[in-house]
């Protein structure tokens, strides 16, 4: 394709590439999902209060996401599972912590209560 008059084509492309900004109006009307609302809140986002714990003396402890809050409630709630080391009787709130304790062979020290008395060893089931 041989085009002889490049100046005319360049002028046509330049004219068509200029948008008419006067007809656009407010950008908030065109992009409501991208621009935040004027009052600062956006729909569908979590508020600061959603991931806070007010139970069992936490006084509004804030968590980064909901799953961390759920794990916190499970571990610190009244019906929390306790994982006990079969060697020394240490208590853990997570089975992974108990397993790591066993892998590191941390059972060689005597477990004591906060008052200094030795904690009895757990009974081993036959």
Swiss-Prot record:
<feature type="zinc finger region" description="C2H2-type 2; degenerate">
    <location>
        <begin position="83"/>
        <end position="115"/>
    </location>
</feature>
<dbReference type="GO" id="GO:0008270">
    <property type="term" value="F:zinc ion binding"/>
</dbReference>
<keyword id="KW-0804">Transcription</keyword>
<dbReference type="GO" id="GO:0005634">
    <property type="term" value="C:nucleus"/>
</dbReference>
<feature type="compositionally biased region" description="Polar residues">
    <location>
        <begin position="38"/>
        <end position="48"/>
    </location>
</feature>
<keyword id="KW-0677">Repeat</keyword>
<keyword id="KW-0539">Nucleus</keyword>
<dbReference type="InterPro" id="IPR036236">
    <property type="entry name" value="Znf_C2H2_sf"/>
</dbReference>
<feature type="region of interest" description="Disordered">
    <location>
        <begin position="17"/>
        <end position="52"/>
    </location>
</feature>
<keyword id="KW-0863">Zinc-finger</keyword>
<feature type="compositionally biased region" description="Basic and acidic residues">
    <location>
        <begin position="115"/>
        <end position="126"/>
    </location>
</feature>
<keyword id="KW-0479">Metal-binding</keyword>
<feature type="region of interest" description="Disordered">
    <location>
        <begin position="103"/>
        <end position="126"/>
    </location>
</feature>
<comment type="similarity">
    <text>Belongs to the GLI C2H2-type zinc-finger protein family.</text>
</comment>
<keyword id="KW-0805">Transcription regulation</keyword>
<feature type="zinc finger region" description="C2H2-type 1; degenerate">
    <location>
        <begin position="51"/>
        <end position="76"/>
    </location>
</feature>
<keyword id="KW-0862">Zinc</keyword>
<comment type="function">
    <text>Transcription factor that probably regulates the expression of the gene cluster that mediates the biosynthesis of squalestatin S1 (SQS1, also known as zaragozic acid A), a heavily oxidized fungal polyketide that offers potent cholesterol lowering activity by targeting squalene synthase (SS).</text>
</comment>
<protein>
    <recommendedName>
        <fullName>C2H2-type zinc-finger transcription factor M5</fullName>
    </recommendedName>
</protein>
């Amino acid at each position: 394709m041989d085009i002889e008059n490049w100046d005319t084509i360049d002028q046509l492309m330049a004219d068509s590439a200029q948008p008419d900004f006067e007809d656009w109006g407010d950008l908030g009307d065109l992009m409501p999902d991208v621009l935040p609302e004027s009052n600062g809140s956006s729909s569908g986002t979590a508020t600061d209060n959603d991931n806070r714990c007010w139970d069992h003396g936490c006084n509004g402890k804030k968590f980064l996401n909901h799953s961390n809050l759920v794990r916190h409630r499970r571990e610190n709630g009244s019906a929390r599972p306790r994982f006990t080391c079969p060697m020394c009787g240490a208590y853990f709130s997570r089975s992974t912590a108990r397993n790591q304790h066993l892998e590191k062979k941390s059972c060689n020290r005597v477990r004591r209560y906060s008052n200094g008395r030795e904690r009895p060893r757990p009974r081993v089931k036959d």
